[in-house]
Amino acid sequence: MSQKSYLVEVIQYILYKLKTDCQWHMLPVSSFFTGRVLHYKTVYGHFRKWSRNGEWEKVWGIILHRYRFFLGMSSVELDGSHTTALRGGERCGYQVRNKRKTTNAIYVTDSQGIPLAMSTPVSGSHNDVYNSSEVLSELFSGLNSSGLIVSGLFLNADVGFEFAFGHYESIIAVLFFI
């Protein structure tokens, strides 16, 4: 197997993981690899290395730009995710309501549920709207740099964000002025 096809399969695996939000160890690795089946930890190692050195963000921007016509951009969804971090991690904190350590992130998806952007994870001791203006700027500037037009998008967010953004005034400012 060539290095190029190997990397394509690794990227397909990562995209599947991001779309399904399944735990790394639960993913069906044998269905992704045509040659030697890689262990999920090997694929996670690639993802972690690429994320840390900025390569994944570049690749993600290229993927979004290349396939932008397949995205459902009639509206975008904004939501938060709380992930249990039983073994700890770089950005985890105790969340009282869940009685465990968690990490939180904000996601933007298209109308089909395809992930477009994800914020930098924060400690679970913070709620979804922690540093909301900075988080939204981070999310939508990344989308802009990939060639997606975000100005004027219809944004669907849950009620927690409505409270934090004063009926979406901050979100609208971000979407129209990036």
Which role does the model predict for each range below?
Residues 1-178:
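Short alpha-helical elements
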